[in-house]
Amino acid sequence: MSEQVKEISQWIIKGDHDLGTAKITYFHIPEYLDTVTFHCQQAVERYLKAYLIFQSTSFRFSHDLIYLLDLIIQNDSDFENCYDTVSELQGYAVEIRYPNETIYLSNEIVDQAILIAKKIRDLVTEKVKIKIDYNEIIDK
């Protein structure tokens, strides 16, 4: 396994941990909507960074999903249709982590955040052609 494949795999696995944490939390403590959406955003961020490594594209470490998508799209227009969905998660990286920020969340928003993270994961793993087992038992 090349170093690049190893690094990509590590980023995907970290994203899977975030997505798994989001789903387990939502299942067991459904009131923690902010925590669930935060982990969905983190999962998408890590999946996008995995793809940037696949592209050999340098990036600054940032929670800005639009910035990461902009970099990806410079070399792969297949991600252009992700802007609208990924932008829904943009505010869940930092702002939602602080008590003085008010972001309205509902079960529908959380369900959508989980779905977005899963779709981005599917797109990235398909593109990088790395199969990483994903625990679908906890899927809702």
Show which residues each predicted segment covers.
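Terminal alpha-helical segments
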Residues: 1-140
